[in-house]
UniProtKB/Swiss-Prot annotation:
It catalyses: a 2'-deoxyadenosine in DNA + S-adenosyl-L-methionine = an N(6)-methyl-2'-deoxyadenosine in DNA + S-adenosyl-L-homocysteine + H(+). InterPro entries: D12N6_MeTrfase_N, DNA_Adenine_Mtase, DNA_methylase_A-5, DNA_methylase_N6_adenine_CS, Restrct_endonuc_T1M, SAM-dependent_MTases_sf, T1MK-like_N_sf. The gene is hsdM. Its EC number is 2.1.1.72. The lineage of its organism: Bacteria, Pseudomonadati, Pseudomonadota, Gammaproteobacteria, Enterobacterales. The keyword Phosphoprotein does not apply. Keywords: DNA-binding, Methyltransferase, Restriction system, S-adenosyl-L-methionine, Transferase. PROSITE patterns: N6_MTASE (PS00092). This is Type I restriction enzyme EcoprrI methylase subunit.
């Protein structure tokens, strides 16, 4: 019987937590995450590679072959197809099987990771493989002070991941890698004092963003995330739509080196071949990649909120083709609109961008107001959606989603107030599938729905100083109790009458106590 996604998730969490308990103590949670995810990745590419070599032939078991039978031609063909090569002796299953008795485990793992990476040298996949295992440091003193201690903890991680009942990755209904990541972040980030929210967009929010960006498109040339994080948004697009709809693959840029590695691992883990994704490392705003790859038919992004950037301190940026049309740069203390303008520049004429934004950018004055004016005057703003608070890790802020389009059929701007659409779960709120469906139906129809959605004329937005706050246009539901004045007056009259009677009764009692006769 197939497990449901809830059962899969619960089982995965239980197993991962068991691994955590086995190695707890010397490695703090944040560093530990890299070892579990690195081992998970190592296991996956080993099984994936074995499956490729065996090609469905039950008579072949790649893991049992001797390394010496591998010819140069076999190796060359495999690297051209898969992007890397793993010898039978280097497979996860063979290393994990001997992990508890291998005195050279940490050195062997390091050699294997170097060999896998170097197998791609000189091939088109070189950049996609390089540095993937950089955060799996087998020599780290956090694993223990002696080689014996290091090996014991590495063995515990390998044996734990070996025991994960993963089955066929493609049959799983959940984003396995992302779910492991989400689980580890939520359990460790608070204790480690580090926030994982900027690196990971929860799957329920990712689902909504992907559907917004891909809505109505029968096919897209490629999908792009300028602040890719761990790749969760790009992968949600893959999960939401048939593989063939995204023709040329997945593109993203990420500034954090560790997260950049996680994003590349994530692509492989979801069976996206090296020639179907391109994740670059670097600062999107000042060192943008993919200028030759644009435009993109679908852009999804959850960029960092209100981060500082060089802005006007770099005099060349105002002439940059991404920012020049607006005539002004985003404030140095708040780069939010710089990411928006970057995405707009990379968007195709038929495409959509769905970007998570800090709410302040929609109503503040100054440069941000001028950028809003540019976006509205050129009819790029399709929809602004306000979400419920506490949907993301690391922030309780109620954020917005900005949907940009270059192919609108009218000049109206749609506003959707989804702030009441959420389900409370432990420390965070979530969007259910029903909530997402409700938002998408309103988004698609562009119909006005009381207290939920309103399509506003261009002239109204202009008259409102280009304010794009949802609350300025969608009237919140009045949750105050409706008072019936006539009924209230009647109740008041009855109450006053009762009070008068009580006073008389009290006076009578007092008079009796004092021995006086009450006058009638």
């Amino acid at each position: 019987m197939k497990m449901t996604s809830i059962q899969q998730r619960a089982e995965l969490h239980r197993q991962i937590w068991q691994i955590a308990n086995d190695v707890r103590g010397s490695v703090d949670g944040w560093d530990f995450k890299q070892y579990v995810l690195g081992a998970l990745f190592y296991r996956f590419i080993s099984e994936n590679f074995s499956s490729y070599i065996e090609a469905g032939d039950d008579s072949i078991c790649y893991a049992k072959l001797d390394d010496s039978v591998i010819t140069d031609d076999i190796k060359d063909d495999a690297i051209k197809t898969k992007g890397y090569f793993i010898y039978p002796s280097q497979l996860f299953c063979n290393v994990a099987a001997k992990a508890n008795t291998n005195d050279r485990l940490n050195a062997d793992l390091n050699s294997i990771f170097v060999a896998i990476e170097s197998s791609a040298y000189g091939y088109p996949s070189e950049a996609d493989i390089k540095g993937l295992f950089a955060d799996f440091d087998t020599t780290s003193n956090r694993l223990g002070n002696t080689v014996k201690d290091k090996n014991a903890r590495l063995a515990a991680v390998l044996k734990g991941v070996e025991g994960l009942k993963l089955g066929d990755f493609n049959e799983h209904q959940i984003d396995l890698f992302g779910d492991a990541y989400e689980f580890l972040i939520s359990n460790y980030a608070a204790n480690a004092g580090k926030s994982g929210g900027e690196f990971f967009t929860p799957q329920h929010v990712s689902k909504l963003i992907a559907q917004l960006a891909m809505h109505g498109q029968t096919h897209v040339n490629k999908i792009y995330d300028p602040a890719a994080g761990s790749g969760s948004l790009l992968l949600q697009a893959k999960k939401q739509f048939d593989d063939h709809i995204i023709e040329e693959g997945f593109f993203g840029q990420e500034i954090n080196h560790t997260t950049y590695n996680l994003a590349r691992m994530n692509m492989f883990l979801h069976n996206i071949n090296y020639d179907k994704f391109d994740i670059k490392l670097g600062n999107t705003l000042t060192e943008p990649h993919f200028r030759d790859e644009k435009p993109f038919d679908a852009i999804v992004s959850n960029p960092p909120y209100s981060v500082k950037w060089i802005g006007s301190d770099d005099p060349t940026l105002i002439n940059d083709e991404r920012f020049a049309p607006a005539g002004v740069l985003a404030p140095k203390s708040k780069a939010d609109f710089a990411f928006v303008l970057h995405a707009l520049n990379y968007l195709s004429a038929k495409g959509r961008a769905a970007i998570v934004c800090f709410p302040g950018i929609f109503y503040r004055g100054g440069a941000e107001q001028k950028i809003r004016q540019y976006l509205v005057d050129n009819n790029y703003v399709e929809t602004v959606i306000s979400l419920a608070p506490n949907l993301f890790f690391g922030t309780t802020i109620a954020v917005n989603i900005l949907v940009l389009s270059k192919h609108k059929t009218d000049t109206k701007v749609q506003f959707i107030d989804a702030s009441e659409l959420f389900k409370k779960e432990t420390n965070n709120n979530i969007l259910t599938d029903a909530h997402i469906e409700q938002i998408m139906q309103v988004f698609a129809s562009k119909e006005d729905v009381a207290h939920l959605a309103k399509s506003v004329a261009f002239e109204t937005v202009v008259a409102n100083d280009y304010n794009l706050s949802v609350s300025s246009y969608v009237e919140a539901k009045d949750t105050r109790e409706i008072i019936d004045i006539a009924e209230l007056n009647a109740e008041l009259k009855t109450t006053v009458s009762k009070i008068d009677q009580l006073r008389k009764d009290i006076d009578a009692i007092v008079a009796e106590i004092e021995g006086c006769e009450v006058q009638k």
